[in-house]
């Protein structure tokens, strides 16, 4: 949710649900069985312009590999998510600006880290929280786990981990409009300054609880280093199966330092 305000200077912080909505300790080899593969298309929030694409591979154990691709198909960033829990270790690397961030094991605990190109790595212990802690794509797992209680009760609060700021922010999840096919949820900051920031919204299919759309500030910076508002669609037609070879190819795929025109 990277919006700069005088009242809250660290609104560079963002909510990476775009998601599905990378990890240092990830096992590199994928199993031989087929795995889920799907794609997302990120549009500018105010129009039909395609900004980038996401290609997701999800193993049976919930581990996830994501390539972020230019409009010409070249990959510029990669994310590895350790497992399918609500608070997994992960690592995101963007070759365009040399930025990296994530959460990893450290000694007997865990730590957040981030690093801008040419700068020293910043790190801090993962803070404790009285709220349910959610990390990166773990938001998807959280929604699936709490689906029934979210639908029947009031808003729920989560502590979302923001490695870019080395802290957490409390968010409120509120069920939105629903119909026979789609359930929507709205995420807003659970603080007095929450009205200063735009809400995030996600839409899930009710039948199989599949993410269909994300609207809000994304987790991928633009050419100016800002986090733009995006609308990411996850079409059913771009959903299928892949084998272990596809995982390995995505893991070894070179990342470009600049997106060129088509």
Region locations from a protein language model:
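Bacterial N-terminal signal peptides that target proteins for export
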Residues: 2-18
């Amino acid at each position: 949710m990277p919006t700069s305000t005088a009242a809250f200077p660290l609104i560079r912080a963002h909510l990476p649900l775009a998601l599905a909505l990378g990890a240092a300790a990830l096992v590199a080899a994928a199993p031989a069985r087929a795995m889920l593969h799907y794609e997302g298309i990120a549009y500018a929030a105010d129009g039909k312009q395609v900004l980038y694409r996401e290609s997701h591979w999800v193993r049976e154990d919930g581990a996830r590999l994501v390539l972020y691709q230019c409009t010409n198909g070249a990959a510029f960033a990669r994310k590895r998510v350790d497992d399918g829990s609500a608070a997994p270790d992960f690592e995101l690397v963007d070759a365009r600006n040399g930025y990296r961030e994530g959460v990893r094991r450290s000694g007997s605990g865990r730590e957040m880290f981030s690093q801008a190109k040419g700068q020293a790595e910043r790190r801090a212990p993962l803070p404790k929280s009285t709220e349910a802690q959610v990390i990166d794509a773990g938001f998807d797992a959280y929604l699936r786990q709490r689906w029934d209680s979210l639908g029947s009760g009031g808003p729920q609060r989560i502590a979302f981990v923001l490695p870019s700021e080395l802290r957490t922010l409390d968010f409120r999840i509120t069920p939105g409009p629903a119909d026979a096919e789609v359930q929507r949820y709205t995420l807003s900051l659970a603080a007095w300054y929450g009205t200063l920031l735009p809400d995030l919204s996600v839409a899930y299919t009710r039948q199989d609880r599949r993410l269909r759309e994300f609207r809000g500030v994304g987790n991928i910076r633009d050419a100016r280093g800002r986090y733009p508002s995006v609308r990411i669609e996850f079409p059913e037609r771009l959903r299928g199966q892949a084998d272990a070879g596809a995982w390995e190819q995505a893991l070894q795929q070179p990342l470009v330092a600049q997106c060129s025109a088509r």
